[in-house]
Every structure is written in C-alpha cells, then in structure tokens.
Amino acid sequence: MLISKTLIFYQVVNIVSQKGSGKRRWKMENGDRYVYVVDVSKCYGCLSCVAACAAENNVPVGYFRTWVERYAMNGRVAFVPKICNHCDNPSCVHACPVNATYKTEEGLVLIDDEICIGCGACIQACPYGARFRNPVKGTADKCTLCNHRIPERLPACVESCPTSARVYGKMSDKAVKEILSKKNAVVLKAYTGNEPHTYYVSLTGVE
C-alpha cells in the first residue's frame, strides 16, 4: 500500500555539456530492440543518475530528464527512478500537431527540435510526466536514452549507477533476458494503453 509520495529534487549547478544534441541513428538486427530495466531493490537514492544525465545532456537547472521518487510503503522506503518510458504506442506522438515527436524503428521516442513549436500538447499527453518545455530552446524536452552514445556506450544514467539498478540493452542480451525472466517485471500505468517499454522489477504499489 502506498503511504506517501515525495519527489526528490536534485539541483545540478554549473554543469554544461553539448554532447546530447545529435540525431544519431543505428541499425538493429533481426527486429531486436533496446529496453530499459530498473531494479528498485538496488536503488538507494544517491542521485548519481540525475547528475550524470544533467551533465551529459545539458539539462537546464531545475528541470529533469530523469528523476528519483521516494515512496514509503509497508514500513520501508523505496526509491523509484523515473524516465521517459519510450512507449510502443506513445500518446505524445499521437498528440503532436506537427509530427515533431516520433518513434524510431529502434524503439526510441524522440523530438525533432527543428520542427517542434513548443505548444506543449505532448507534455500534456504524457501520462508519466516525463516531458517539459525547455526554457532555453522553447521546445519540448525529455529523456533520449542518450541515443548519441549508443551502441558504443550506455546511457549516462546507467553508466553512472553504482549499484547497477538501471540496465539498458537489447532484448536479446543475456543480462536483460535474465532479469526479465527471473524477476516479476512490470510496467507503469499499463492501463493507459501506451505500452511502455521501461520495465521495473522489485516494485509493488507504485505508479
């Protein structure tokens, strides 16, 4: 049972990077795709992921592409990392009036800054609160899973996690298959029909 919910705010100051602005694409083989898995039992709220994301993607201070929520449940505290779920049926894509938000064949949901008019329709449509209007660019912004780093490197949040609470890889990867097969993997807000492709394990009573 969910007792309380508190957002953990983490402010990163004077961290500047332009690494996350590319539109890089890579080719998948045999219909494989990338997925993101979070093991809540391994997260203790250190926020290394939040800081790494901000540095890698030049996220404005006070805004977040990834964040960590703290829940008190059944006498224990659970830290739950949140990001864009890169859904298979993304409501944000359907809501965009100019087709600036799109889904790639690799499974990512991305935003074309050159097309986005900053109307906010996609922000309102996202059931996960994963989008915001970038105050510098004036366009919608969100997690890209550091697509400019893949496949040579992992997303910054995954690479920086000291407990390996975040896992990112192809569905065919051994590590991903093992986690999804041995643990009770769930998605958030499945009832929305968005078909999210971010999976959580060791999670109970959190949306």
Curated annotation (Swiss-Prot):
The keyword Cell membrane applies. Residues 1-28 form the signal peptide. GO terms for cellular component: plasma membrane. Keywords: 4Fe-4S, Cell membrane, Electron transport, Iron, Iron-sulfur, Membrane, Metal-binding, Repeat, Signal, Transport. It is a peripheral membrane protein. One of its GO terms (molecular function) is metal ion binding. Disulfide bonds: none annotated. It is found in: Cell membrane. [4Fe-4S] cluster 4 binds at residues 96, 116, 119, 122. [4Fe-4S] cluster 1 binds at residues 43, 46, 49, 161. Part of a membrane-bound tetrathionate reductase that catalyzes the reduction of tetrathionate to thiosulfate. TtrB is probably involved in transfer of electrons from TtrC to TtrA. Probably composed of three subunits: TtrA, TtrB and TtrC. This is Tetrathionate reductase subunit B. It comes from Archaeoglobus fulgidus (strain ATCC 49558 / DSM 4304 / JCM 9628 / NBRC 100126 / VC-16).
